[in-house]
């Protein structure tokens, strides 16, 4: 790569709810894409991710955007509705902007804030972060070859 070329940048959004788990996705993401190429953005919860993802994708600064959240059944509302709205919104953001928007927004069948579940989901989010980074690299490479 010559000096005229710059390395692609990636945006990573993470929800603050269950931050100790969602932050692990960023850890996995930066195992595949150097942290120096990743701008990190925090949002209150999963529901706020699609709007920011769309804005970041539309900015023209990023090759791809990834968004991480853990949507769980808190017993108050139907978490499936939130999860569906988030995934639909993230997909729409990518389709509207033409920039890949990748979801690491997971909705487990069961989640309890026990040491056992925290450990399982923490490790799972590292893997899902890696997978999101690999998808970002693959899809941007494929799309670049189509444009050539």
Named regions from a protein language model:
Residues 109-127:
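Phosphate-binding/catalytic loops
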Residues 52-90, 94:
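Glycine-rich phosphate-binding loop
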Residues 24, 28, 89-92, 131, ...:
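Alpha-helical scaffold segments in soluble metabolic enzymes
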Residues 32-59:
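Active-site rim loops that border cofactor/substrate pockets in soluble metabolic enzymes
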Residues 82-108, 127:
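Short, acidic/small-residue loops that bind anionic groups at enzyme active sites
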Residues 16-17, 43, 69-71, 106-111:
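Short, ordered loop/turn segments at secondary-structure junctions
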Residues 2-42:
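Glycine-rich phosphate/diphosphate-binding loop of Rossmann-like nucleotide-binding domains
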Residues 123-148:
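A charged, well-structured terminal subsegment
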């Amino acid at each position: 790569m010559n000096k005229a070329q710059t390395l692609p940048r990636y945006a990573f959004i993470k929800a603050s709810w269950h931050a100790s788990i969602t932050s692990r996705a960023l850890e996995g993401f930066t195992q595949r894409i150097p942290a120096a190429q990743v701008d990190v953005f925090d949002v209150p919860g999963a529901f706020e991710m699609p709007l920011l993802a769309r804005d970041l994708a539309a900015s023209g600064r990023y090759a791809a955007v990834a968004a991480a959240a853990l949507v769980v059944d808190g017993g108050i509302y139907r978490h499936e509705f939130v999860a569906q709205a988030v995934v639909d919104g993230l997909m729409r953001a990518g389709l509207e902007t033409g920039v890949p928007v990748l979801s690491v927004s997971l909705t487990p069948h069961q989640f309890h804030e026990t040491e056992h579940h925290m450990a399982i989901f923490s490790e799972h989010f590292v893997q899902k972060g890696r997978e999101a980074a690999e998808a970002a690299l693959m899809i941007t490479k494929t799309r670049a070859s189509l444009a050539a």
